[in-house]
């Protein structure tokens, strides 16, 4: 996860989003596929985590809470990570709202994606069989005067410490283990993610 934003060179082509047509008493009604899935309380977090994406995801969660505060929300994650502040706005909303947020990793959940994956409701965090998870410490690149660089370096160390504390809380690992294991990029398979405490089980097929 990065301390400052990075441009996603593989931004999705929204023209390729399929439409779903439903018959209603008033005739046909068409939705884009993601809006239709939102009716089923399914949200997708795909691509780099950045401010625009975070705004959309938090808005969807708040909308679903307003519709029904008792029903679970399902957050599907396929992300290489992204900006810490954007990710933390999603994290705080997940913890703030009344419905449980079930997280499901498909493809990959790396960096901030992994952090959000493990932040789901206990017992409701899943990986699909061939997905992968990667955890590491926050990344930062700064330029400018030496004093400013020092200020940013101190801030990123504070962010690192806070995120390690939260990871320890959600995984059940000790803070020392989290600090050691995130010192470098650490990749985990779906099964290893269960063993580590990042998720609760591997989804192979719907019941």
Curated annotation (Swiss-Prot):
Keywords: Cytoplasm, Hydrolase, Protease, Serine protease
InterPro entries referenced in this protein's UniProt entry, alphabetically: ClpP, ClpP/crotonase-like_dom_sf, ClpP/TepA, ClpP_His_AS, ClpP_Ser_AS
One cellular component term from this protein's GO annotations in UniProt: endopeptidase Clp complex
Main location: cytoplasm
UniProt subcellular location: Cytoplasm
Enzyme Commission numbers on file: 3.4.21.92
Keyword Mitochondrion annotated: no
Reactions performed catalytically: Hydrolysis of proteins to small peptides in the presence of ATP and magnesium. alpha-casein is the usual test substrate. In the absence of ATP, only oligopeptides shorter than five residues are hydrolyzed (such as succinyl-Leu-Tyr-|-NHMec, and Leu-Tyr-Leu-|-Tyr-Trp, in which cleavage of the -Tyr-|-Leu- and -Tyr-|-Trp bonds also occurs)
Enzyme class: hydrolase
Any one Gene Ontology BP term: protein quality control for misfolded or incompletely synthesized proteins
Role this protein plays: Cleaves peptides in various proteins in a process that requires ATP hydrolysis. Has a chymotrypsin-like activity. Plays a major role in the degradation of misfolded proteins.
NCBIfam families (alphabetical): clpP, PRK00277.1, PRK12553.1
Subunit structure: Fourteen ClpP subunits assemble into 2 heptameric rings which stack back to back to give a disk-like structure with a central cavity, resembling the structure of eukaryotic proteasomes.
Family as reported in the entry's similarity comment: Belongs to the peptidase S14 family.
Protein name per its UniProtKB record: ATP-dependent Clp protease proteolytic subunit
Species in which this protein is naturally found: Yersinia pestis
Name of encoding gene: clpP
């Amino acid at each position: 996860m990065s301390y400052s934003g990075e441009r996603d060179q593989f931004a999705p082509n929204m023209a390729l989003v399929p439409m779903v047509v439903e018959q209603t008493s008033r005739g046909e009604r068409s939705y884009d596929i993601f809006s239709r899935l939102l009716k089923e309380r399914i949200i997708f977090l795909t691509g780099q985590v950045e401010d625009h994406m975070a705004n959309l995801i938090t808005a969807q969660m708040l909308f679903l809470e307003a519709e029904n505060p008792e029903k679970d929300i399902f957050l599907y994650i396929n992300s290489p990570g992204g900006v810490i502040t954007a990710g933390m706005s999603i994290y705080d909303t997940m913890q703030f709202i009344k419905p449980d947020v079930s997280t499901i990793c498909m493809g990959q959940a790396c960096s901030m994606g992994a952090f959000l994956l493990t932040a789901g409701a206990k017992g409701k965090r899943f990986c699909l069989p061939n997905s992968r998870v990667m955890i590491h410490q926050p990344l930062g690149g700064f330029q400018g005067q030496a004093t400013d660089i020092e200020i940013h370096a101190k801030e990123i160390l504070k962010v690192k410490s806070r995120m390690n504390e939260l990871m320890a809380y959600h995984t059940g690992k000790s803070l020392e283990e989290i600090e050691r294991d995130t010192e470098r990029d650490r990749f985990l398979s779906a099964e290893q993610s269960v063993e580590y405490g990042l998720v609760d089980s591997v989804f192979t097929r719907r019941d």
